[in-house]
């Protein structure tokens, strides 16, 4: 059996602007970028096993992305998982990132990137309040 590895693409207006947001405010790293005519057109960002591609190659799709990112912890207790989401919220808000609470049958943290793509951090083991 082989493993699959997904790299979802988020369509953005300006890859450089998006890179600054994902790296400086969300804590991702960027291992590579593709440049054309002196500007970044596609780039990858990574954080804690999550890999996303940022691309400005399909303008009509800009801002229409929705990505669920599960927050997994080694010690799988409701308290540990809730604490992980709380810590993430504190980290992001300290960097000036607006974070919204949500629910889809379980607790969510929702972050909009500069183009309106949504990153939904979830803890599916925690019931919604």
Regions of interest found by a model, annotated:
Residues 9-51:
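Core segments of cupin and vicinal oxygen chelate
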Residues 48-52, 59-61, 72-76, 85:
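Short, charged/polar surface micro-motifs in flexible loops or helix N-caps
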Residues 4-8, 63-67:
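Short amphipathic alpha-helical segments
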Residues 37-41, 61-63, 104-107:
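Short acidic/glycine-enriched loop/turn segments that link adjacent beta-strands
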């Amino acid at each position: 059996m082989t493993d699959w590895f997904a790299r979802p693409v988020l369509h953005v207006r300006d890859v450089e602007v998006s890179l600054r947001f994902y790296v400086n405010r969300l804590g991702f790293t960027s291992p590579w970028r593709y440049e054309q005519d002196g500007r970044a057109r596609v780039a990858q960002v990574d954080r804690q096993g999550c890999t996303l591609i940022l691309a400005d190659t399909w303008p009509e799709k800009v801002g229409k992305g929705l990505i669920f990112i599960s927050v997994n912890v080694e010690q799988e207790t409701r308290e540990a998982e809730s604490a992980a989401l709380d810590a993430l919220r504190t980290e992001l808000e300290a960097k000036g990132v607006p974070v919204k609470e949500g629910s889809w049958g379980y607790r969510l943290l929702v972050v909009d990137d500069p183009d309106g793509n949504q990153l939904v951090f979830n803890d599916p083991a925690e019931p919604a309040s």
